[in-house]
Amino acid sequence: MERFLRKYNISGDYANATRSILAISPQWTCSHLKRNCLFNGMCAKQNFERAMIAATDAEEPIKAIRLIELAKEAMYDRETVWLQCFKSFSQPYEEDIEGKIKRCGAQLLEDYRKSGMMEEAVKQSALINSERVRLDDSLSAIPYIYVPIKEGQIVNPTFISRYRQIAYYFYNPDAADDWIDPNLFGVRGQHHQIKREVERQINTCPYTGYKGGIFQVMYLPIQLINFLRMDDFARHFNRYASMAIQQYLRVGYLEEIRYVQQLFGKVPSGEFPLHQMMLMRRDFPTRDRNIVEARVKRSGDENWQSWLLPMVLVREGLDQQEKWEWLLEYMDRKHICQLCYLKHSKQIQTCSVIDVRASELIGCSPFRTVKIEEHVGNEPIFKTKLIRDQQIGRIGDHYYTTSCYTGAEALVTTAIHIHRWIRGCGIWNDEGWQEGVFMLGRVLLRWELTKAQRSALLRLFCFVCYGYAPRAYGTVPDWNNLGSFLDIILKGPELSEDEDERAYATMFEMVRCIITLCYAERVHFAGFTAPACESGEVINLAARMSQMWMEY
């Protein structure tokens, strides 16, 4: 291969196309209809290596150039390329898969440093607790920021606690007759008094040890208190509470409109659209007057999802009033997956997804109608059927497929998904890196990308494998800010032509190995067992990474 490319001075996209076709040629299915595939009496697409060797040995540059043009032309039909790649990669043969993945991992580790990703990781603030909570906007704790009142006074508390700078004010929801904005003048004084009193009585956060002041209050149903003693429940609920406070703090600023559109899909006219959406009277089939009351008067269970507001179903209700019943039924029955509920209980195969960030970056519509696929864990991600321009996404613990019409759209959509759901802390550490590599492989093979976009894709590959790997002193980089993450990925340095060729070859090989690895349970062959993190060359990778951190 390298001899052929160097002999005829092939580089850039032509070299990438040649490498790709060579890898999948043995399993290529060709109809021979155009007849342009015939080369010395054989199909060059199905026998690309033989044709390449024949052209090289015969010193026939014209035929060699024709082969390269054939490879480049074949890559134009990206859907066929993806199908042929998937067919080829899922038919494993005896090879050293482990060794190849290790070599790709070592190369990506070097690229992690050279691409600037490691330098950016050093700049990120440190996280001591590596157990990252994955948040998305399909669930919200915003109903709990509203003040419960009875005859003009805040309902008396039954218990108080805190999470960092947030006071937790527990009360009986049945004792309240209304819920109002905490900034209204009539309750502002009482609201501030609650903050001072919680800070005085509970000096230290019981969850984190934080000893600073109290700046916000969340009003929580008393039924929630026992569940917050469960570590996993508290970790997730507290993070959603923190996210709700951050959104509430944008009320009155320009960002409020953006948040409201992301959460609800529409922005009402007038002041304070967030409060309007939450407190506006709705035509519920029950006595509940607004979304806040509907949520806080319904208890959840030991699943933290059952206590949050299901925003996918809220948007369904906003679109069609008769679907408010779905929202109430979902909360009454304490469901925890909205897409499972739509697919299995309501026989709905599609739902709406809103992505304001992608819309701002690439100019596409923020509104998407997506197809609901399988729940995470039911089927491996690589078994999801992808046709035409579809890419995989995720709401909570449920996959969906969505259409991406350009390479830029596919790249940004996948980057946002990876930032939210993939926690790259080294190859073989968990299944997340395989899921991430599979999704990036779909982007690499299905869409035509520019060199700048492939440069961004390489940084995503590095992040998927090493983005959350521990730094020199055991801390992990804090990548929680999506805006900063996308700036680093999309606005980083562009690869040179030689670097682009090498990066493409590494990414292509990693994708090929991962798809082959995904079929391990079906087809067993030598060299297929993935090693444990503590063994062999994986330790060497960790040692090399540790040494690289020490250089910064």
Swiss-Prot record:
Write out the similarity annotation. Answer: Belongs to the orbivirus non-structural protein NS1 family.
Q: What is this protein called?
A: Non-structural protein NS1
